[in-house]
Amino acid sequence: MKPENKLPVLDLISAEMKTVVNTLQPDLPPWPATGTIAEQRQYYTLERRFWNAGAPEMATKAYMVPTKYGQVETRLFCPQPDSPATLFYLHGGGFILGNLDTHDRIMRLLASYSQCTVIGIDYTLSPEARFPQVIEEIVAACCYFHQQAEDYQINMSRIGFAGDSAGAMLALASALWLRDKQIDCGKVAGVLLWYGLYGLRDSVTRRLLGGVWDGLTQQDLQMYEEAYLSNDADRESPYYCLFNNDLTREVPPCFIAGAEFDPLLDDSRLLYQTLAAHQQPCEFKLYPGTLHAFLHYSRMMKTADEALRDGAQFFTAQL
């Protein structure tokens, strides 16, 4: 798509989304566009500090979990001693950026609104980790906490997966992995998916939307994919292109959230339409006026806070 033919997104977004876009952090250096991945990761962590401030306090513990790839850090957010379930959270960042600090506020609010234990998994980033390593790390963490639930004083009889962007893909892929390989980690009561990518290679929204403001041009998306996958054949794997998996049976209840001006919106729409057509329990909600990644901005955006509350409410309704 010729750039001039794309929608004028920054003119169309909501007033509160514009406020976020125009919020300056004077102490922040410029984005290292030509820098190394390590430099971009460092910048992303610094930039997110402002947006993570003021999150609710609660009991928080960090644990290292063994996997066949080595130790993976996890962080437990415990809003109450007797949690009705445990939610595993997978952060976004195009598979190449992000960590437990960049998504701290999201996880704390999700724990607070659901009153469930939330476990963030600091999976190995790409290109250091190639598909399917990250999914195997997530599954290993689930199995570990299921086996050690009594020691960690968590309720693993009912679990869920949640994630934003690339983390949403990982959340659903992990749930399908457990189903397909018949791995018992407790009943998967629900999956919470905020503006994920699920396997479309092209779409109307991918053509009309995406630019420097969200890091989701066609070139950006190709770069993330090439960093994450091991080879070209992986593009058709049912744990990367989730539309190649069996979505007609035993899919856990899915909350699917879409951002109106997100180039990945059609992925969410297609996922919802596919699940609904096969009577799989699901709910789709579109958040008007929003850009991809809006969930980070609950400090300033009521819509972001609403989206987190909606996901938490959906999950607790499944328990």
UniProtKB/Swiss-Prot annotation:
InterPro entries given in the database record: AB_hydrolase_3, AB_hydrolase_fold, Acetyl_esterase, GDXG_lipolytic_enzyme, Lipase_GDXG_HIS_AS, Lipase_GDXG_put_SER_AS
GO cellular component, one term: cytoplasm
Designated name of the protein: Acetyl esterase
Protein purpose: Displays esterase activity towards short chain fatty esters (acyl chain length of up to 8 carbons). Able to hydrolyze triacetylglycerol (triacetin) and tributyrylglycerol (tributyrin), but not trioleylglycerol (triolein) or cholesterol oleate. Negatively regulates MalT activity by antagonizing maltotriose binding. Inhibits MelA galactosidase activity.
The entry's keywords: Cytoplasm, Hydrolase, Serine esterase
Chief location: cytoplasm
Family: Belongs to the 'GDXG' lipolytic enzyme family.
Organism: Escherichia coli O157:H7
Active site: S165, D262, H292
Motif (Involved in the stabilization of the negatively charged intermediate by the formation of the oxyanion hole): 91-93
NCBIfam families referenced in this protein's UniProt entry, alphabetically: PRK10162.1 (NF007547)
Location(s) in or outside the cell: Cytoplasm
SUPFAM superfamilies per the UniProt record, alphabetical: alpha/beta-Hydrolases (SSF53474)
EC number: 3.1.1.-
Entry's transmembrane regions: none
Pfam families: Abhydrolase_3
